[in-house]
């Protein structure tokens, strides 16, 4: 109001006492509208009927103020959006349950896979076991034949080798021994004859000489005896020695007998062959019989039962999820509605206060306008219709210098806050606020999706668990069948091998015993027994021991063990798919979509649909806000151009400004100075004041001659008034800005300048300019040429 009062006071300064010389056609007792109060300075009383709305009528409509209506529109939009979301959630629930049923069917089919796969796996396993056993028996048959021949070959080789060695060694030795004995016998016989002949002749000569010697000496006479000495006669002993003859045939008779009795081991070899071949032939016979009739029966394998999963039917997780989601949305809806309704109700309070304040402000403005006879009808209407923006424009205009800039600043505020512009802005902001509320709802939905995804993950776990249980049960039964097959083969097939190896070892022992017995019979008690037994142990004993050791190893390791089925043979792939993040590997995923599965996708679709609606509405609302800022920018460009450009004068095609001095229009109230009369009396002429403007001075009539310096205005500092420099309309016609070269201008017809150049400068500078100044004064009966008053400013 202070700005408005200052503005009116500036208009009032354009009038002086001359106004009293041009009274209006009507007096102070002018005709009023119906219901008008006779006091022109007071607002109509409340007990009068008026064609305009009073305070109570205005207050009765505060509940339909723009902000409440805007919030109600937002509430309606949210209700429409939430109803759409509820329908989408219901559709998503139906789709999710349908998808869950599909997943349940898929899960049941997956869990029943062991039932379908086991038949083929059982047949394949049975065929594999059959072929493996037949192949093993064929190999066993060939192996037995090979081992049999190898054992016989080794035994034959050893016996033949040993026989050849014995024959070579013993026969050769015996032949040498017999020949040597015969040669020794012949040599001894010949030697004895020669020795005995030589001994006989030698002993004969010795006997003769000894007897002749003894006869010549008288031994008896020496010892006193008459006995004659004995005579030595060795011929009989020599004859006996000469009669000794060695017979070689008697000496090598035993060797010849031994040579004739050397064994050929044919009996041992034949006995060994018959003993060794017997178990081999028996085993081969059994293997051949089993091989022809063996076929593994696949019916002994278990077949799992079909599985029917009911994790959707028995589990209310999806139902609970959507019920909880609807409850969450309802809570959010209630909170938003309560907040918006409270805001809409509370908006009535400041709007009621605004109506009260506006009503009082309008009363004050009406009184001021009526008291000061303000004549700018459009400005009056604008300030009355838009009190807030007009007052803000007045305050903003004070920051600018010059009348034109101040007017343009006020125009910019009026342009930016016009009803159409604010309507566009309000629609845009309301739309953005609605998008914000819907965005909160969208985030609420997205926040609940992980819970549903977790439930879907549990569904997959149920499927894998059922599949794993079926797989484990089938693997347990199948492995039991395989273990029984292993036991049967090891006992019925490789039992023969164990029997055969034991029999072969026993046969080899018998072979060794028979060989030893034959050698004992042949060489027992002879000097060749130990060498022969050493050679036998070296050539045969060690080899037989090695064969027995190998056969023992074969007996210890001759068993079959078919591989067993793993417990996760049917569930391994499904379990692995749960740990893989790619959609193509997840057996519950739909490869055609990028979402994890159809169940969560049903909820995601709701969020995407709402997100698309929010984006569309946000773009529309943002476009409205942008349109508003475009309007503001257009006004700003217009103001900048107006401030920077030069106004055209009337001579250049421009239009002159409206004047405040409408003396030619008697029905207009002029801004007359009513109580403050300057000069010596109330009817003195106008006094002249120098003013600074446009580099030159301008004079305007203020008061009368003899006006004192700084005359008071109701005891307050002198207000500033406004005067037009456009042509002045008076009773004598219309004049342009007057030119007074010097001296006093005894005229009451508007402002004037010193020379023509000054007038042109003023008109060229700004045709719409209005100069303001405080009261001037006279010095020594004449005005000063410069420096009077304050420099003018533009308003």
Swiss-Prot record:
Keyword Cell division (UniProt): no
Residues with attached carbohydrate: 189, 259, 270, 288, 469, 483, 498, 505, 520, 580
GO biological process: plasma membrane fusion involved in cytogamy
Basic and acidic residues compositional bias, start-end: 752-762
Region entry Disordered, spans: 11-37, 736-795
Cellular component GO terms held in the UniProt record: mating projection tip; plasma membrane
TM segment ranges: 67-87, 150-170, 331-351, 422-442, 617-637
Cytoplasmic compartment residues: 88-149, 352-421, 638-795
Residue spans of biased composition, Polar residues class: 13-24
Primary subcellular site in the record, as a coarse category: membrane
Topology relative to the membrane: Multi-pass membrane protein
Function of the molecule: Involved in cell fusion during mating by stabilizing the plasma membrane fusion event.
Protein name: Plasma membrane fusion protein prm1
Organism the protein comes from: Sclerotinia sclerotiorum (strain ATCC 18683 / 1980 / Ss-1) (White mold)
């Amino acid at each position: 109001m202070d700005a408005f009062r200052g503005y009116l006071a500036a208009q009032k300064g354009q009038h002086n006492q001359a106004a009293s010389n041009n009274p209006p056609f009507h007096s102070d007792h002018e005709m009023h509208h119906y219901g008008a109060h006779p006091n022109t300075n007071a607002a109509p009383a409340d007990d009068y009927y008026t064609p305009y709305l009073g305070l109570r009528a205005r207050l009765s409509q505060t509940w339909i103020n723009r902000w409440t209506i805007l919030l109600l529109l937002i509430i309606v939009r949210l209700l429409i959006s939430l109803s759409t979301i509820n329908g989408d959630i219901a559709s998503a629930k139906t789709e999710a349950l349908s998808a869950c049923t599909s997943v349940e069917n898929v899960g049941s089919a997956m869990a029943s896979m062991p039932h379908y796969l086991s038949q083929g796996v059982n047949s394949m396993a049975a065929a594999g076991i059959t072929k493996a056993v037949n192949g093993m028996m064929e190999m066993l048959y060939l192996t037995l034949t090979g081992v049999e021949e190898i054992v016989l070959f080794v035994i034959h080789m050893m016996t033949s080798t040993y026989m050849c060695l014995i024959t070579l060694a013993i026969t050769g030795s015996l032949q040498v021994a017999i020949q040597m004995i015969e040669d020794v016998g012949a040599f001894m016989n010949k030697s004895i004859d020669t020795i005995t002949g030589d001994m006989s002749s030698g002993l004969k000569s010795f006997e003769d000489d000894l007897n002749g010697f003894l006869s010549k000496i008288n031994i008896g006479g020496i010892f006193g005896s008459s006995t004659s000495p004995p005579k030595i006669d060795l011929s009989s002993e020599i004859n006996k020695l000469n009669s000794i003859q060695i017979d070689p045939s008697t000496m090598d008779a035993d060797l010849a007998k031994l040579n004739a009795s050397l064994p050929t081991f044919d009996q041992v070899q034949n006995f060994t062959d018959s003993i060794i071949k017997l178990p081999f032939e028996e085993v081969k016979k059994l293997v051949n019989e089993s091989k022809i009739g063996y076929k593994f029966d696949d019916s002994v394998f278990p077949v799992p039962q079909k599985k029917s999963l009911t994790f959707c039917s028995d589990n209310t997780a999806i139902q609970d999820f959507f019920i909880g989601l609807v409850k969450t949305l309802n809570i959010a809806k209630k909170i938003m509605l309560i907040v918006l309704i409270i805001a809409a109700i509370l908006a009535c309070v400041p709007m009621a206060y605004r109506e009260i304040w506006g009503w009082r402000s309008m009363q004050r403005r009406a009184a001021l306008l009526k008291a000061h006879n303000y004549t700018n009808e459009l400005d009056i209407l604008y300030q009355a219709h838009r009190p807030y923006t007009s007052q803000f424009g007045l305050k903003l205009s004070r920051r600018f210098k010059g009348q034109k800039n101040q007017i343009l600043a006020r125009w910019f505020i009026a342009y930016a806050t016009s009803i159409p512009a604010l309507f566009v802005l309000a629609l845009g902001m309301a739309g953005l606020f609605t998008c914000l509320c819907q965005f909160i709802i969208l985030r609420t939905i997205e926040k609940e999706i992980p819970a549903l995804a977790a439930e879907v993950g549990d569904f997959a776990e149920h499927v894998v668990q059922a599949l794993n249980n079926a797989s484990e049960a089938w693997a347990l039964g199948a492995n039991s069948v395989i273990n029984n097959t292993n036991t049967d083969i090891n006992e019925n097939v490789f039992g023969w091998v164990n029997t055969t190896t034991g029999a072969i070892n026993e046969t080899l022992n018998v072979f060794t015993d028979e060989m030893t017995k034959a050698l004992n019979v042949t060489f027992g008690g002879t000097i060749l027994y130990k060498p022969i037994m050493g050679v036998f142990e070296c050539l045969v004993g060690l080899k037989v021991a090695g064969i027995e050791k190998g056969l023992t190893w074969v007996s210890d390791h001759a068993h079959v063990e078919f591989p067993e089925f793993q417990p996760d043979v049917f569930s391994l792939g499904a379990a692995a798919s749960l740990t893989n993040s790619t959609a193509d590997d997840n057996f519950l995923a739909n490869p055609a979509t990028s979402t994890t599965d159809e169940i969560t996708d049903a909820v995601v679709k709701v969020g995407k649909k709402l997100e698309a609606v929010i984006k569309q509405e946000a773009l529309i609302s943002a476009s409205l806000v942008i349109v508003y800022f475009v309007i503001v920018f257009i006004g700003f460009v217009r103001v900048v151009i107006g401030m920077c450009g030069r106004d055209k004068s009337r001579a250049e095609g421009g239009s002159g400004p409206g004047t405040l001095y409408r003396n030619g229009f008697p029905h207009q109230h002029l801004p007359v100075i009513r109580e403050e009369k300057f000069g010596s009396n109330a009817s003195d002429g106008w006094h002249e004041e120098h003013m600074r403007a446009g580099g030159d001075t301008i004079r305007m009539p203020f008061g009368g001659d003899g006006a004192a310096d700084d005359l008071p205005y109701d005891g307050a500092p002198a207000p500033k008034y406004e005067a037009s420099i456009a042509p002045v309309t008076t009773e004598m016609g219309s004049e342009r800005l007057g030119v007074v070269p010097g001296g006093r201008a005894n005229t009451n017809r508007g402002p004037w300048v010193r020379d023509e150049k000054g007038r042109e400068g003023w008109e060229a500078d700004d045709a719409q300019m209005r100069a303001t100044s405080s009261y001037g004064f006279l010095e020594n009966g004449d005005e000063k040429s410069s420096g009077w008053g304050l420099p003018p400013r533009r308003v």
